[in-house]
A protein has these predicted regions:
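Short, small-residue-enriched loops and turns at beta-alpha junctions
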Residues: 119-122, 149-153, 181-184, 201-202, ...
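Short acidic, glycine-rich surface-loop motifs adjacent to enzyme active sites
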Residues: 137-153
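Short beta-strand scaffold segments in enzyme catalytic cores
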Residues: 55, 100-104, 246-250
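Conserved phosphate-binding/catalytic region of the ribokinase-like
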Residues: 4, 8, 210-332
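Structural motif
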Residues: 19-21, 111, 141-142, 237
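Conserved N-terminal subdomain of the carbohydrate kinase-like
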Residues: 59-142, 320-332
Length: 332
């Protein structure tokens, strides 16, 4: 195992103002087969929640650093692909292979062919990743804590410790987590929590069992109550994505709705990550109020569903669409 180091720093972005640091514990190697000539097209990328978020942050022009672990053949390929995209990567070597998936989209639907598990990080690997993240966060405008695909990659309490330690350095901490990981992050205290309506439902935070016939129709008031509870548990602000029903945000005690124009759907996967990343990038770059950032995030999420690439987007299109996002206070 080598000491943690910056694998790539093409333009000195680690010292740039408005930088976003993404904690991405275990990126994936993703292989997607699309329809095309000669039997189809094969697309190979680095992926995973943190990578998709970093990709959108970069698309919106904010400097971004990815803190992550890489191991085995799949990890080496994933890291090389990130470097090829020009990312600033703080890489920790790990003994085990990185997880990977192969998805077939030739019929228009995303069908899993192979999905491998992600082994747990060793104590030493996690310690190195943790220290590297704290170091990089010192000069960052926003620190975004993402989760790995595998449940066993790292202890959920890592998020409590990270949130608390980052808060002690006055870092603006945003998390896009659910379940036990979110519970622990809240204990550490975070500035912004982003969660989906489905995750609130699965976590039992809406007062409706996820298997109940009415589970998909939890009313808005139940979501708002859950948002206030999240705030009481340690969140400064709470943002909830609701697929086609727009975004709800609890900001300074006021609930607002952000509604983007309806778009034709190509692939819904990654829309929530684009929302999260666009909010982080806007706060880092512009230092504006959270309402404006939520409008940009809603636009990024809406445009994401029109594209095949996860976490991809056009800055001009996103900012233009943001002007058409309606943000209003919710009464009651």
């Amino acid at each position: 195992m080598t000491a943690p180091g910056r694998a790539h720093s093409p333009s000195g972005d680690e010292d740039a103002p408005g930088r976003v640091v993404v904690f991405a514990p275990a990126p994936l190697l993703t292989i997607t087969i699309e329809a095309g000539r000669f039997g189809g097209e094969v697309h190979v990328h680095a992926g995973g929640q943190g990578v998709w978020q970093a990709r959108m942050v970069a698309a919106l022009g904010a400097p971004v650093t990815i803190c992550a672990t890489f191991g085995g053949e799949t990890g080496r390929v994933a890291k090389a692909l990130l470097l090829d995209e020009g990312f600033d990567v703080v890489a920790i070597d790990r003994a085990d292979h990185a997880a990977a998936y192969v998805h077939d989209r030739r019929d228009g639907e995303r069908s899993p062919v192979v999905e491998t598990d992600d082994p747990p990080l060793s104590r030493h690997e996690l310690d190195e990743l943790y220290a590297a993240t704290l170091r990089e966060a010192m000069g960052a405008a926003v620190v975004l804590l993402s989760g790995p695909a595998g449940d066993e990659v790292l202890p959920a309490d890592t998020y409590r410790r990270l949130a608390a330690d980052l808060g002690a350095f006055d870092c603006l901490v945003m998390v896009d987590l659910a379940g036990e990981r979110l519970d622990h992050a809240l204990q550490g205290g975070v500035d912004i929590v982003k969660v989906s309506h489905e995750e609130l439902l699965d976590d039992g935070r809406l007062g409706v069992d996820a298997g109940h016939a009415d589970a998909g129709r939890a009313d808005e008031s139940a979501i708002v109550e859950a948002m206030h509870r999240l705030r009481s548990e340690g969140a400064g602000a709470v943002i909830v994505s609701r697929e086609s029903e727009g975004v709800l945000a609890l900001i300074d005690g006021t609930v607002v709705r952000a509604t983007a124009p309806d778009m034709e759907v190509v692939d819904t996967k990654g829309a929530g990550d684009s929302l999260t990343a666009a909010i982080a990038a806007t706060l880092a770059r512009e230092g504006v109020d959270l309402r404006r950032a939520v409008a940009v995030g809603a636009a990024a999420g809406a445009l994401n569903v029109t594209r095949h690439g996860l976490g991809t987007g056009d800055e001009g299109a996103i900012l233009a669409l943001a002007e058409h996002v309606v943000v209003t206070d919710r009464e009651g």
